[in-house]
Amino acid sequence: MEAARTAVLRVKRKRSAEPAEALVLACKRLRSDAVESAAQKTSEGLERAAENNVFHLVATVCSQEEPVQPLLREVLRPSRDSQQRVRRNLRASAREVRQEGRYRVLSSRRSLGTTSSGQESEYTPGNPEAAGNSGFQLLDLVHEEGEPEAASAGSCKTSDPDVILCNSVELIRERLTVSEDGPGVRRQEEQKHDDYVYDIYYLETATPGWIENILSVQPYSQEWELVNDDQEPEDIYDDEDDENSENNWRNEYPEEESSDGDEDSRGSADYNSLSEEERGSSRQRMWSKYPLDVQKEFGYDSPHDLDSD
């Protein structure tokens, strides 16, 4: 089984721009057979066939000539809390990852380690012994801010700051050029190089082989993949409930059963539904029935007993 290799991204960006804490590199998934299926020819098939690789930020260097291997050895050194440190840093900086910006691949080469002279050796297809060694793949990228048209226009302005425009038309003027390679030109080139820095990202690939057929590179902004927001039901405590909420189970009281109240309400409803004549006759019946009710309540057999008392 082929050993896992480390892939490295070296991103050139302006010093004033903010670096992304992680980059997602999408490339075509490697297939064992040479013939592609018909499903992969569609857009949905290409999305399923794409493989996303997350590269983590290692360090930022000032020059492209600085070696990458010492930084990788420092990061890939066995440590018990290395994975926790990376996840903690990603979780802390996930909200600050910038959404804008594009990344364009400049070059890709494969380094197989450091030679005795201290220089990095590159992979050659005709060297099978070198191919068997465990090295890393280095990809150079450049961070382009804004749209391609704006970026190209900005590059033209920075390359020729003396251009004069009239109604968006470039004017032609004559000037005497003493020397194009004078100290002023070299100073501008040095200042231009000082305005850029290089961010080093790494990915310890778990699958054998090299990264090829790159589809896109974008900042890592999926915060829900870094932080697990799924909360189990047993993790919800009673202290977190809002007692003033109407939907709280504490505010649900059982309804008291009152038969007398129901009968009184039914009687008043029936009385209100009667007309004036019916109400008058009902009052007479109630008044004539009142002595009989009193006799029954006090235990008298006849009205004479009530008069004798």
Swiss-Prot record:
Acidic residues bias spans: 233-245, 254-263
Post-translational modification Phosphoserine, affected residues: 302, 308
Signal peptide as annotated in the record: none
Subcellular localization(s) per the UniProt record: Cytoplasm; Nucleus
Biological process, per Gene Ontology: developmental process; hematopoietic progenitor cell differentiation; protein transport
Domain of life (superkingdom): Eukaryota
Keyword check for Transport: yes
Region (Disordered): 101-134, 233-287
Any Pfam family the entry gives: Iwr1
Keyword tags: Cytoplasm, Disease variant, Epilepsy, Neurodegeneration, Nucleus, Phosphoprotein, Protein transport, Transport
Disease in which the protein is involved: Epilepsy, progressive myoclonic 12: A form of progressive myoclonic epilepsy, a clinically and genetically heterogeneous group of disorders defined by the combination of action and reflex myoclonus, other types of epileptic seizures, and progressive neurodegeneration and neurocognitive impairment. EPM12 is an autosomal recessive form characterized by onset of tonic-clonic seizures and/or myoclonus in the second decade of life. Affected individuals develop cerebellar ataxia associated with progressive cerebral and cerebellar atrophy on brain imaging.
Reported function: Directs RNA polymerase II nuclear import.
UniProt protein name: Probable RNA polymerase II nuclear localization protein SLC7A6OS
Gene: SLC7A6OS
